[in-house]
């Protein structure tokens, strides 16, 4: 239409040409585990309560690894069954760093399923001497990646990345019929398209 208007009605420019092409969607298939695969993997870390709890939280809440590793007891409300995400952990140049979350939308409150809140309550009951502002999980992302690689090998489930546990959680929510906007908010995404 704009080309026609340029040719026959003296329109100076075609605004669509200035805008440029939208481009192709970069949405490539994401790797994820179904619940049966996750459960098979989880069996391989059942002898490590701290690691097991960390993987349970990643899978059932969809939080980022840095968000998990920054959690303190103050961030947990076992009565309300919620986790407040308000910071992130990184290890930079051999030093532990607590930083702001990835984006403003990353600051959020995540609900836990009843069984997870109960498991977390049991886990926390065995934490002696931990201060309310200390990190609940005192290991690093590389420790989690190592445990995951070992667990994958031992369980025989398909290989995915640590971050793909977020995709696993999102996929589970889609299967449950949760609206895309709710999933995006739960995962702390700025845009629904990211989800």
Predicted regions and their residues:
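Basic, Lys/Arg- and aromatic-enriched nucleic-acid-binding interface segment
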Residues: 11-71, 79, 115, 126, ...
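N-terminal core-binding DNA-recognition domain of tyrosine site-specific recombinases/integrases
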Residues: 3-15, 27, 49, 138-142, ...
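Short, contiguous acidic/charged loop-to-helix segments that flank catalytic cores in large enzymes
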Residues: 29, 45-46, 97-107, 134-140, ...
């Amino acid at each position: 239409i704009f080309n026609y208007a340029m040719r026959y009605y003296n329109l100076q420019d075609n605004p669509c040409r200035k805008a440029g092409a939208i481009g192709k969607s970069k949405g490539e298939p994401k790797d994820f585990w179904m619940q049966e695969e996750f459960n098979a993997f989880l069996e391989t870390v059942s002898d490590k309560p701290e690691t097991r709890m960390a993987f349970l939280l990643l899978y059932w809440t969809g939080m980022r690894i840095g968000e998990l590793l920054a959690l303190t007891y103050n961030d947990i409300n076992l009565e309300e069954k919620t986790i407040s995400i308000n910071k992130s952990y990184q290890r930079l140049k051999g030093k532990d760093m607590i930083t702001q979350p990835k984006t403003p939308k990353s600051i959020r409150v995540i609900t836990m399923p009843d069984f997870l809140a109960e498991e977390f309550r049991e886990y926390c009951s065995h934490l002696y001497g931990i201060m309310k502002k200390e990190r609940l999980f005192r290991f690093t992302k590389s420790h989690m990646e190592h445990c995951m690689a070992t667990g994958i090998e031992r369980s025989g489930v398909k290989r995915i990345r640590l971050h793909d546990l977020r995709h696993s959680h999102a996929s589970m929510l889609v299967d449950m019929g949760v609206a895309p906007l709710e999933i995006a908010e739960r995962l702390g995404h700025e845009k629904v398209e990211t989800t």
